[in-house]
Every structure is written in structure tokens, then in C-alpha cells.
Design a protein with these regions (language model features):
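Mixed-charge, Lys/Arg-rich low-complexity intrinsically disordered regions
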Residues: 2-29, 34-38, 45-48, 120-125
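Charge-rich, low-complexity amphipathic helices
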Residues: 17, 52, 61-63, 95
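Intrinsically disordered, low-complexity boundary segments flanking structured domains
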Residues: 28, 57-62
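Generic detector of isolated residues embedded in canonical secondary-structure elements
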Residues: 38-40, 72
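Short, glycine/acidic-enriched capping/hinge loops at junctions between secondary-structure elements
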Residues: 42-43, 52
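Residue-level signal for short segments within beta-strands and strand-turn junctions
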Residues: 43-45, 75
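Short, solvent-exposed secondary-structure boundary/capping segments
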Residues: 48-57
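Intrinsically disordered, low-complexity, charged/polar segments
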Residues: 63-125
């Protein structure tokens, strides 16, 4: 019979509960649940990694949890393009198939035959 010496199921459960897998991936087009903007994901933080000042500037009633993935987006709304930092709980997959017009998208990504975005090979080296 194998020994379970050194095995701490409580610790393992705690570590697993703290390990998050991002729901979205680089190059995916997502939209915000509440606000009218969308964008291409260009970076992912496994949990909140911005300033406390930025976090506190969000109204308390809509402030997201810090213990979840946060996504950097090349974002756009009806008026302009910008960089957004959004919690996973506030994102949905954008299924419109429309290209994102943010000017930096073409610097980092190329479109594939299906209309998705994949990182440019030159950036992977």
C-alpha cells in the first residue's frame, strides 16, 4: 500500500482553488457585458495587476473581484479606439465576426482565414 506521508489534501485543495485558467485567449475578440465596447485580447494577467488608484476609481457597486484573470484589450467603441483593462467577469465572446479597427491590432496580430486573430510570428521570437 502506498504511503500518503507528506500529502496535505487541504493544502492541495487550497492551491487548486487559487489556480485560475483564463477563459479567453490571446487574439480572441471579446465585448464588455455592461458597456458598449469590444476588443482583441493582447495580454492576460492571471489576477488583478494594475494600480490601487485605478481599482478604486471603479464605482464600488460594479468593482470586479481582484482574484480573477484581467485582460488587456485593443478596444474600440462607436467613437474611438483605446487600450482597456477588463476583468474576466465583465467579458463575453464577441461573435459578430467584424474586424476590430484599433490601429495597433495590425502591428501585433494577423487575421486568419476564419477571421480570427493570431500573433504575428515575428513577435514570438
Amino acid at each position: 500500500m502506498a504511503s500518503s506521508a507528506g500529502h496535505n489534501p487541504g493544502l492541495c485543495d487550497w492551491v487548486m482553488s487559487k489556480t485560475r485558467v483564463a477563459q479567453f485567449k490571446l487574439g480572441q475578440v471579446v465585448r464588455h457585458r455592461r458597456f458598449a465596447f469590444r476588443g482583441v485580447i493582447f495580454d492576460i494577467d492571471p489576477e488583478f495587476n494594475n494600480t490601487e488608484e485605478w481599482y478604486q476609481s471603479i464605482p464600488a457597486e460594479v468593482r470586479p473581484r481582484k482574484d480573477q484573470p484581467f485582460y488587456h484589450l485593443f478596444a474600440e467603441n462607436a467613437e474611438t479606439e483605446y487600450i482597456a483593462y477588463v476583468s474576466e467577469q465583465n467579458l463575453l465572446l464577441d461573435t459578430s465576426g467584424e474586424p476590430v479597427r484599433h490601429p495597433q491590432v495590425a502591428e501585433v496580430f494577423e487575421r486568419d482565414a476564419a477571421g480570427g486573430y493570431r500573433p504575428r510570428v515575428s513577435l514570438l521570437h
